[in-house]
Design a protein with these regions (language model features):
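Metal-dependent phosphoester/phosphodiester hydrolase catalytic core
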Residues: 26-512
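Bacterial N-terminal signal peptides that target proteins for export
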Residues: 1-8
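Sec/Tat signal peptide C-region and signal peptidase I cleavage site
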Residues: 21-24
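Bacterial N-terminal signal peptides
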Residues: 8-18
Length: 512
């Protein structure tokens, strides 16, 4: 018998012994109460996650495609659960077939996890349709009643039921500092881990993670509101990174943070940006907290009745700080990696999954791309000549669709880039309208701003195609060989209503 055949037989025997120790893929006693997840899905691999009830060995089994639930696994791994990892366990499974649906389960003794499902990405040459959904901004903090203070994460349930190839949970996946009055701030690793467990105690999030592959990313509230290391330090950053990576099967690199890209067939490549690891301090101090420092004087005067401070001129030092080329949002290494990758992409559509709005919104710009004007220009310059780019963003707690412009107001009128952005969410936190109400101390102000500024065409407003600032939900995306369609959807799966009262029409981008 050849050495190769001997090795194959020994490997087969070893897998059989592991499989035999857990039996076929039947269920054991219910366990792993926080569910399962599959992240970083590629054509041939995925990173599978669970949280056990105790330290010690855990067996992960992967079922063959189209097999019954009692079939023997095609992969079986033994992984040791450590208390130092908060009992979370992750394993990269390789050697899978592209474009194939797999199921998986974790075991610890006679206790089994729920069954999870994911579909591997198709080959880069596969001319297939791809469907996915995106949302973010989910606070599970309890209110005075002891129940979640905002809602029960119904948006996640709608996404889980949509039958997507994968989903995206991007930004503010916990709230270390909830907007609910009196909530304690989670600063340590242990406190942040408790926030992740709090979210996973809600069934809709567990359903989302088990239903399909899930790409995850952070924004500020995984650390603290409007976070930058320059302002808040490395200690809370390190705690946020550790807790996030314990609970989200994602890939982090010190040089580029959570930036990475994934190809899904001939027609789609996704680029996930990290907007927190390398950004400079905000320009808020130089601007004295001005509510709209970059808005033209005519726009400021038009809204001075709502916010009297807008009648005052903007200090030049404020504008200089916002436009300073020394300040960055992405950092040089991440920007270079992103620029190289998106310019080299052969996918029909390039989707940039983006932590804060790239479009100009003017109100409170400090934490957005507008507050880092030089880096915004660098990104837009990098995207010049790249065809079929669409930006998907969370963070704003609103549903907005608009073109990314280099200039919205001015003597020559709007100057567009041809790049469209869809902002989606939130899942569970104060909506943008309610935040405007609170900031101005005037209930109903958010709806006024949405209708009077976001919808009218320039120079009277931003001219957004869809503007809804007071509805929970997500963005549903369908990619075909010729079109990319984004439909804003509510927490129940319905179409988001525009502030005008009509349904928000989908964004349809046709391949060029």
């Amino acid at each position: 018998m050849s050495r190769v055949r001997t090795a194959v037989l020994l490997l087969t025997l070893a897998v059989s012994l592991v499989v035999g120790s857990v039996g076929a893929a039947k269920e054991g006693k219910p366990g792993f109460p926080l569910g399962v997840a599959a992240g970083e899905v590629t054509p041939t691999s995925a990173k599978l996650w669970a949280r056990a009830s105790r330290a010690g060995p855990v067996t992960l089994t992967v079922l063959p495609p189209r097999a019954g639930t009692r079939a023997n696994p095609i992969r079986a791994y033994t992984v040791r659960v450590q208390a130092d990892d908060d009992l979370t366990v992750q394993r990269v499974v390789t050697g899978l077939r592209p474009g194939t649906r797999y199921r998986y389960r974790f075991w610890q003794r006679d206790v089994s996890s729920p069954l999870g499902t994911f579909t591997t990405a198709p080959r880069a040459t596969a001319n297939v349709r791809v469907r996915f959904a995106l949302t973010g901004d989910a606070d599970a903090t309890a209110g005075p009643s002891g129940r979640p203070g905002f809602n029960g994460f119904e948006t996640y349930r709608a996404m889980a039921r949509a039958g997507n190839d994968f989903n995206v949970n991007f930004g503010d996946t916990i709230y270390s500092d909830s907007e609910l009055a009196g909530a304690a701030v989670a600063r340590t690793v242990a406190e942040k881990r408790a926030k992740y467990r709090l979210g996973l105690a809600l069934a809709p999030l567990r359903q989302l993670r088990a239903a399909a592959g899930l790409y995850s990313g952070w924004d500020d509230h995984e650390f603290v509101n409007d976070f930058s290391r320059a302002e808040h330090g490395s200690e809370i950053y390190d705690a946020g990174v550790r807790a996030f990576l314990d609970y989200a099967p994602a890939t982090y690199r010190p040089a580029t943070g959570l930036y990475r890209s994934f190809r899904w067939g001939r027609n789609l490549e996704l680029f996930f940006l990290d907007g927190r690891s390398f950004r400079s301090a905000k320009a808020t101090a130089a601007c004295g907290g001005d509510i709209a420092p970059t808005a033209p004087a005519a726009v400021r005067q038009a809204f001075a009745a709502l916010a009297p401070a807008l009648a005052r001129p903007v200090p030049q030092a404020c504008l200089d700080a916002i436009t300073s080329p020394e300040r960055t949002l992405l950092g040089a290494a991440q920007l270079a990696a992103f620029t190289r990758a998106i310019r080299a992409s052969k996918a029909t559509f390039k989707v940039v999954v983006n932590p804060v709005p790239l479009m100009q919104l003017y109100a409170l710009p400090y934490d957005r791309w507008e507050g880092y004007a030089a880096d915004r220009t660098r990104v837009l310059d990098a995207l010049q000549g790249v065809r079929n780019v669409v930006v998907l963003t969370t963070d704003t707690h609103a549903h907005l669709i608009g073109e990314v412009r280099t200039q919205t107001f001015g003597p020559s009128g709007p100057v567009g880039t041809g790049i469209w952005e869809v902002i989606a969410g939130p899942v569970a936190t104060n909506t943008y309208a309610k935040e405007i109400d609170e900031f101005l101390g005037a209930p109903g102000s958010g709806a006024v701003v949405t209708g009077a500024f976001f919808k009218p065409q320039p120079p009277g407003g931003l001219g957004l195609r869809c503007a809804q600032t007071d509805v929970y939900g997500y963005a549903q995306v369908t990619v075909t060989p010729t079109t990319l369609t984004v439909q804003p959807r509510t927490a129940s799966g319905g179409i988001v209503p525009d502030i005008s009262g009509t349904p928000c029409a989908p964004l349809v981008v046709r391949a060029t």
